[in-house]
Amino acid sequence: METCLTFQSHLSPPPGDGCRSPTEMEHALNYSELLKANDDPERWECPLGFDYASEKHRFQQFTVAFAAALTITPKIETGACIQDASFHSQLIFPVGLARFHSLRFSNFASFITVKDDDDVPSEILSTILVLADRLGYTYIPYNYLDADYTGSITGVTGIDSWWIRYFDYI
């Protein structure tokens, strides 16, 4: 029996019954192709035309909705906290008493992700997916980012995975 990710009732569910299986979600997008298609061979921190002010505003909208939906107060890192990186902001949120995860917001293609998302409770991951859809983000499952980087950027050493390409300090 396949696991069903359900969406909280106070958030707008996706079309249908408000339930998507992980398999259905992964079949909806070809993540490997999406990562390659948005790779910029010349710009490694952000694409041409990246509007930092707009992205920061959208990140703030996500943060407010995320905190309200889950009744938690995530730690916010953005602005001067993040430099020389392929992402612009992150939310650090608790999972249990002593564990934290970070939800990162890439400078490329409105990508977002949580590193090691297999450990994130389904309620939190479902909320992230609903908010991503509502605010125009594309959630990339971490297992696709942990793969070897096969993109077109040259001249920058240390980019050996898609995680580093889109969601890490460079």
Question: Which stretches of residues belong to each language-model region?
Answer:
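N-terminal, Lys/Arg- and Ser/Thr-rich interaction peptides
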Residues: 2-46
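Acidic, proline/glycine-rich low-complexity IDRs
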Residues: 2-18, 119-170
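Eukaryotic intrinsically disordered, low-complexity regulatory tracts
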Residues: 36-44, 48-49, 65-69, 73
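Short cationic amphipathic helices and targeting signals
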Residues: 49-52, 109-120
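Well-ordered, non-membrane alpha-helical segments in soluble/globular domains
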Residues: 55-63, 121, 125
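Amphipathic, interaction-prone secondary-structure segments
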Residues: 60-113
